[in-house]
From Swiss-Prot:
Statement: the UniProt record of this protein carries the keyword Glycoprotein: no
Database matches in Pfam families: Ribosomal_L31
Parts of the chain that traverse the membrane: none
Record key words, sorted: Ribonucleoprotein, Ribosomal protein
Family as reported in the entry's similarity comment: Belongs to the bacterial ribosomal protein bL31 family. Type B subfamily.
One annotated GO molecular function: structural constituent of ribosome
Gene Ontology terms describing biological process: translation
Stated name of the protein: Large ribosomal subunit protein bL31B
């Protein structure tokens, strides 16, 4: 491997502020912030959405009735196709 061309890969803490969840994972992201977890200092990145807060993963997503919109379409434009 060539020296000096690869990004600095290190353990980083990502904080999902909407769910107040911390993720400790490897990353090459650059940040000036740090946080202390379990006696060790880590680079710290704030994120707004993660799997802990995204509606798709939490099951709090809205489901729209497809039958209602289809029926409404046929009610408005059904006569044009006959």
């Amino acid at each position: 491997m060539k020296a000096g061309i690869h990004p600095d890969y290190r353990t980083v803490v990502f904080h999902d502020t909407s769910a107040d969840v911390y993720y400790r994972t490897g990353s090459t992201i650059k940040t000036d912030r740090t946080i202390e977890l379990e006696g060790t200092h880590y680079p710290y990145v704030i994120i707004e959405v993660s799997s802990a807060s995204h509606p798709y993963y939490t099951g709090k997503q809205k489901e729209y009735s497809k039958e209602g919109s289809t029926a409404r379409f046929h009610q408005r434009f059904g006569n044009f196709f006959k």
